[in-house]
Amino acid sequence: MKMKTNMKKLLAVLMMLALALGLLAGCGGEKTASEGGNETKPVKIGILQLMEHPSLNTIRESIIEGLTEAGYTEGDNLEVDYQNGQNDMTVMKTAAQKFVEGGCDVIIAIATPAAQAVLSETTDIPIVFAAVTDPIGAGLVDSLEVPGGNVTGTSDEVSAEMIMNLAEEITPGFQKIGALYSSGEDNSASVIANLKEYAAANDLEVIESAVTNSSEVQQAAQYLADKVDIVYSPIDNTVASAMAVATEVFNEQKIPFYVSADSMVQDGGLATYGIDYTVLGKETSAMVARILEG
């Protein structure tokens, strides 16, 4: 089943509040930012982002904006050390060590591998993650209600079933679903497992094309293009960073490409029910502010 050439590009973004996990009882610390006009030393926050791409950048920018709204301003009572993880675990672990040695009050980790890297380096400094699809499966928290340890954060989980229901509304009658994702991202693995369960229950076929880095996305997309009716990609940072090449392939073959983030639609995907990453960033910043305030 091919998408009609005159089909208008659709954006079906569900404006969802991020799932804010319970704050840790032990995460509060002595407030060091100015309070009531009293000058004290700035609070120090480390931000580790998996890689640079629109979704993650939006989260980081919204976190900083949210902290400013909460009264924490860079150059005044807030010091921010931002590190780009370059999608490399060695780089991320080095950055996490830098945060620990530098005495950060809170560490913010954007995306699953970044959070895992930070957690491997400290069990004392409060860690607030953002854009982690499956915090339990990733080994970050014990439960969503009571995270445990020094970790809390916001989740961007969107079930594959929701996206498939959307696909059935827009492009009904598909039988073969292409799954384009990174084999190295735990967040993608859990969603693809959900997709397979949905497919089995609905007599549909899933054809997988997994990548290990963004340079493989074009070839993976070409592999799927002549085998499937639609393609689905979860909230996958590797695919998100290479949306231009993926959408070029699928547009040429007129294959509907469903994604799981609003920014991925803006970068060429057909449609999504997804997280508003500006809202998620603000929710994350609110959690950080509460920790700083003790």
Where do the language-model regions lie?
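Short, low-complexity disordered leader/linker segments with a strong preference
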Residues: 1-44, 69, 73
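Hydrophobic alpha-helical segments within soluble ligand-binding/sensing domains
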Residues: 38, 135-176, 275-293
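Extracytoplasmic "Venus flytrap"
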Residues: 44-70, 81-90, 184-186, 237-238
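An alpha-beta-alpha
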Residues: 45, 63, 152-200
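Structural motif
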Residues: 79-101, 209-225
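Beta-alpha junction/loop-to-helix N-cap segments that form part of ligand/metal-binding clefts
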Residues: 85-142, 236-251, 255-260
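Pocket-lining segment of extracytoplasmic ligand-binding domains
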Residues: 180, 186-255, 261
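Small-residue-rich helix-loop
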Residues: 266-268
